[in-house]
């Protein structure tokens, strides 16, 4: 029984998905009250003795409350456990913004238990603020101003709370290429101006633990020097992960935790480490050594989702103080990281104090109610009832904006189990605040029935009565423990109740009693289940006109098939045994070219209903009937000697009949026969009417054809020779005329111009002088 404590508030948490009138109980293989409760949120169990009749299964006891009452089950005998919620309020004297402190839920599968959570924003709640600054060279002006901020930051916190503390940390990037220049000289002084004193690059340095000493803040921050790196994105997510993962080193208290992230550029995230050959995923653990993140070159950057989970787990609210050009980038980041804000930082960070105050007021005035990770068997939904009259229903987390100090808001939390669960707990909290609600979850799957009875008259003295059902002793089975197993196992007994080695006993519609199926009595009116394996019934047959087998007048259903009365036929007894609609004018059923089914012709392929007379796509059988036509009409052809036997199915008509098919084919002598085919009832049965006259064409004159062909060839040859001779003569004549013209043009004398004398005379000039 559920514990009864006067100091606990008991809330009924049944949240049905449908109204009572539309509730249904879908049950399958139900034999106990627990099985029934697990079947659905609307199922109830009747524990009344002898509630089930002969052949009725124990699952009859499982139904909706309304159905059980209508079947005669007394209301006191109906077992219907409900999901419940018990809450314990916060202890007096403790400042709590979230109540109640503890909730115990008893969950029935499919039914939700609901309870209210109240949040009241307190004034002056303690705050820890950690200032995380980008020390890349582009932030040189900002560092000079931040060094003077210690007193202003604490004064700003004291305006909000009586207990405020501040801390400081800085970051640059991983110290490998391509993120920083790894040249030894550049590692000593990464700044572009060599005259400027800079510190070597680093991933994250924890400078000052959270403190309320503003002088110490200014002293420690004043010692910081600017640094530098190569690429534009910085290693800020690496630093934020260490701030969240190292609570003892940072000095976080269990109060409101703010992380101010100041930068003028973007950020590296998971996967970027591969550029520097860093392949190991970020493990989300603390790796500070001497206040330095020395393992940064061993682990990749964290993903945004991983960082968001770690910040929420550590209850840290980030405030991104970024320059104007980066505001939109970090606004996208706040959509993924809950309870985070963005503020526009001036170029020299002079407005950082006002930025933090504005962001804190924005964060603290919005409340997100959420829970830690749950198994798939538990579902949680939130209804938010905010002070500004805004309501949200069935959301994955509670959400209220514009929450004012000391003005309570209410969230209704609904928890549903999808099955009978093990005892477990989970925590609900308002993100960014320290208070939590512990929820303890217990299963509500057992029925508180009357105590078990060993009444011999009910269970034959061989078992006990539990929730109206006999639980038999070893060696006995049956509804009233009437069957003795004689040492046989239940598997052996059930084997004879399975059809064709099926895994379902008695087709799922009966109980195996002493190795035989006892079929259930169906909930469906007039339905009877029968058969050796309860495989048959009288309703699962084809229907006609909305009735099984067309109704009792047409036929009855026997084990899935209709048995029709004498006047009807068909798979659903939908047809009258008549052929009137299938007879043609000659009284032949479907013209002999089909079968009559349900008084409608089912024609042979090609023929068309309603009477299978026409076959538009069938080939004309003219050529096939040409031999019979020739022998019947002209007593000649290939069938002339046995015409009556070969053409007995074809009748010769003396006069033409309209509507026949005209044919024109050659006979055995080459003459054309013209005849008309008229189809009779049946396939390939025709009458034929033949024209009296044949069209015989005289044969060709072979001698004339041959003589003409030879003569034509000879004449063509002679003509071609004459043409060739004429062309040759014309060509020779043209050449002769050209020769005559050339001869007339020549100027030759009697000497041959080509002749050269064989003697040469040479005159000596000196001979003449002498």
Curated annotation (Swiss-Prot):
Domain I-EGF: 449-482, 483-535, 536-574, 575-613
Domain VWFA: from-to ranges: 124-363
Regions that span the bilayer: 702-724
Keywords attached to this entry: Calcium, Cell adhesion, Cell membrane, Disulfide bond, EGF-like domain, Glycoprotein, Integrin, Magnesium, Membrane, Metal-binding, Phagocytosis, Phosphoprotein, Pyrrolidone carboxylic acid, Receptor, Repeat, Signal, Transmembrane, Transmembrane helix
List of residues binding Mg(2+): 136, 138, 234
Motif Cell attachment site per UniProt: ranges: 397-399
PSI domain residues: 24-74
Modified residues (Phosphoserine): 746, 757
Positions bound to Ca(2+) 2: 173, 229, 231, 233-234
Residue intervals on the Cytoplasmic side: 725-770
Classification via InterPro entries: EGF_extracell, Integrin_b-2_sf, Integrin_beta_N, Integrin_bsu, Integrin_bsu_cyt_dom, Integrin_bsu_tail, Integrin_bsu_tail_dom_sf, Integrin_bsu_VWA
Ranges of the Extracellular topological domain: 23-701
Subunit organization: Heterodimer of an alpha and a beta subunit. The ITGB2 beta subunit associates with the ITGAL, ITGAM, ITGAX or ITGAD alpha subunits. Found in a complex with CD177 and ITGAM/CD11b. Interacts with FGR. Interacts with COPS5 and RANBP9. Interacts with FLNA (via filamin repeats 4, 9, 12, 17, 19, 21, and 23). Interacts with THBD.
This protein's domain notes: The VWFA domain (or beta I domain) contains three cation-binding sites: the ligand-associated metal ion-binding site (LIMBS or SyMBS), the metal ion-dependent adhesion site (MIDAS), and the adjacent MIDAS site (ADMIDAS). This domain is also part of the ligand-binding site.
Function comment: Integrin ITGAL/ITGB2 is a receptor for ICAM1, ICAM2, ICAM3 and ICAM4. Integrin ITGAL/ITGB2 is also a receptor for the secreted form of ubiquitin-like protein ISG15; the interaction is mediated by ITGAL. Integrins ITGAM/ITGB2 and ITGAX/ITGB2 are receptors for the iC3b fragment of the third complement component and for fibrinogen. Integrin ITGAX/ITGB2 recognizes the sequence G-P-R in fibrinogen alpha-chain. Integrin ITGAM/ITGB2 recognizes P1 and P2 peptides of fibrinogen gamma chain. Integrin ITGAM/ITGB2 is also a receptor for factor X. Integrin ITGAD/ITGB2 is a receptor for ICAM3 and VCAM1.
Record-given protein name: Integrin beta-2
Source organism of this protein record: Ovis canadensis (Bighorn sheep)
């Amino acid at each position: 029984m559920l514990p009864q404590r006067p100091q606990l508030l008991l809330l009924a948490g049944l949240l049905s998905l449908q109204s009572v009138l539309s509730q249904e109980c879908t049950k399958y293989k139900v034999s106990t009250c627990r099985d029934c409760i697990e079947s659905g949120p609307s199922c109830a169990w009747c524990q009344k003795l002898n509630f089930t009749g002969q052949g009725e299964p124990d699952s009859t006891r499982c139904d909706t409350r309304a159905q059980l009452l209508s079947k005669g089950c007394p209301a006191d005998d109906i077992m219907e456990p409900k999901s419940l919620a018990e809450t314990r309020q916060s202890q007096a004297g403790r400042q709590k913004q979230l109540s109640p402190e503890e909730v115990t839920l008893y969950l029935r599968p499919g039914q939700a238990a609901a309870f209210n959570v109240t949040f009241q924003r307190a004034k002056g709640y303690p705050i820890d603020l950690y200032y995380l600054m980008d020390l890349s060279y582009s932030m040189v002006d900002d560092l000079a101003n931040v060094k003077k901020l210690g007193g202003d930051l604490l004064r700003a916190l004291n305006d909000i709370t009586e207990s405020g503390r501040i801390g400081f940390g800085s970051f640059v990037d991983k110290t490998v290429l391509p993120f920083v220049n790894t040249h030894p000289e550049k590692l000593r002084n990464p700044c572009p101006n060599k005259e400027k004193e800079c510190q070597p690059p680093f991933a994250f340095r924890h400078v000052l633990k959270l403190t309320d000493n503003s002088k110490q803040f200014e002293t420690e921050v004043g010692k910081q020097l600017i640094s530098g790196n190569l690429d534009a994105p910085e290693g800020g997510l690496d630093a934020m992960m260490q701030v969240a993962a190292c609570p003892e080193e940072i000095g976080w208290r269990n109060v409101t935790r703010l992380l101010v992230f100041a930068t003028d550029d973007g950020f590296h995230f998971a996967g970027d480490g591969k550029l520097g050959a860093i392949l190991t995923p970020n493990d989300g653990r603390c790796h500070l050594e001497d206040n330095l993140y020395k393992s940064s070159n061993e682990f990749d950057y964290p993903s945004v989702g991983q960082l968001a989970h770690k910040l929420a787990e550590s209850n840290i609210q980030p405030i991104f103080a970024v320059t104007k050009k980066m505001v939109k980038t970090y606004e996208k980041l706040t959509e993924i990281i809950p309870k985070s804000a963005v503020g526009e930082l001036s170029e020299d960070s002079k407005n950082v104090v006002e930025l933090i105050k504005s962001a804190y007021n924005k964060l603290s005035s919005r409340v997100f109610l959420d829970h830690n990770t749950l198994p798939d068997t538990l579902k949680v939904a939130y209804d938010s009832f905010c002070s500004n009259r805004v309501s949200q229903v069935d959301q994955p987390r509670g959400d209220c904006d514009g929450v004012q100090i000391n003005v309570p808001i209410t969230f209704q939390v609904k928890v549903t189990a999808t099955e009978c669960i093990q005892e477990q707990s989970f925590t609900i909290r308002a993100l960014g605040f320290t208070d939590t609600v512990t929820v303890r979850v217990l299963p509500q799957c057992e029925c508180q029935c009357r105590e078990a009875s060993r009444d011999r008259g009910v269970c034959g003295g061989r078992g006990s009565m539990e929730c109206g059902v006999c639980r038999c002793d070893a060696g006995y089975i049956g509804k009233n423990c009437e069957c003795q197993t004689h040492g046989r196992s239940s598997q052996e007994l059930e084997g004879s109740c399975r059809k064709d080695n099926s895994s379902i006993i008695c087709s799922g519609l009966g109980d195996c009693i002493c190795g035989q199926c006892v079929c259930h009595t169906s909930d469906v009116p007039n339905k009877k289940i029968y058969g050796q394996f309860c495989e048959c019934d009288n309703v699962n047959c084809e229907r006609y006109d909305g009735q099984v087998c067309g109704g009792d007048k047409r036929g009855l259903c026997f084990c899935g098939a209709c048995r029709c009365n004498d006047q009807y036929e068909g798979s659903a007894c939908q047809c009258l045994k008549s052929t009137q609609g299938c007879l043609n004018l000659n009284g032949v059923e479907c013209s002999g070219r089909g079968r009559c089914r349900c008084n409608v012709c089912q024609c042979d392929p090609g023929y068309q209903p309603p009477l299978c007379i026409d076959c538009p796509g069938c080939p004309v059988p003219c050529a096939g009937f040409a031999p019979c036509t020739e022998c019947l009409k002209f007593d000649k052809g290939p069938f002339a000697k046995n015409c009556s036997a070969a053409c007995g199915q074809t009748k010769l008509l003396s006069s033409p009949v309209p509507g026949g098919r005209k044919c024109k084919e050659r006979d055995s002598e080459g003459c054309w026969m013209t005849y008309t085919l008229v189809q009779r009832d049946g396939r390939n049965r025709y009458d034929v009417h033949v024209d009296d006259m044949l069209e015989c064409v005289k044969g060709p004159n072979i001698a004339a054809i041959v003589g003409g062909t030879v003569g034509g060839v000879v004449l063509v040859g002679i003509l071609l020779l004459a043409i060739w001779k004429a062309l040759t003569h014309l060509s020779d004549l043209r050449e002769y005329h050209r020769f005559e013209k050339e001869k007339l043009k020549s100027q030759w004398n009697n000497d041959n111009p080509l002749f050269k004398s064989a003697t040469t005379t040479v005159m000596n000039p000196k001979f003449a002088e002498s």
